[in-house]
């Protein structure tokens, strides 16, 4: 389906991020391409170390890209210096994985939520700042009685609500959700996911939702990108990816999801065996080759390097 460029809030072209190590360059993000429509969610899923969090941080320029282009809301921001990026910080935000380690333990809830409002001069008077801070607490479902509490006095769910309120404080268009529920109990996870979905509906937010949990990403995402060793190996709508996975790595990930067994039918699991290729000085071949039976049988004649369906 063709798309109007005005519908695209973020386009990433051949994004790379390499880190120097004593043994050579570590390919954390290597040639990533995608687009996101306004008001939708792109889920990025993969094993630990695949580069999904680095992708999110590089898009926000919390770490500088090695190469490629980042086009946000029609502007190429790739070469923006810190001063120019500062103005964009009110349009792009992040929710971190661990709400405890990402919050200053010396600050109260009032101080934590009001900090972005003060930092970006969104409100000037103390009364305005206090009023908006309380409004943000209401928005994320954090009772006002906790306004003078400190992070260590709250449970994980309430701490994550503080993180969400901080992200919302600048009234962003795009939020990178970096494993926002992985540190929470399952019952609390559902509450936070429902909150994020409601906020998206009410405020028209666009999310990049980073996770290793396939059941969560299916529930939460419009499109899903699967990453392996710095590359997006497959991208499709949520339904397409789960109903008809194409890349062998995607098939193996989906096969590992525990499902209830009905009657005597039992789903055959595709176990991933073999050693993970080192991300340092990667050869120019399929990175899943050492762990993929399909690749071993057909390489080099037919190798699944990247499969993209959907918005590109």
Where are these regions (language model features)?
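Helix-to-loop junction immediately C-terminal to a conserved catalytic motif
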Residues: 60
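A short, proline-enriched helix->beta-strand linker immediately N-terminal to the Walker B motif
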Residues: 169-173
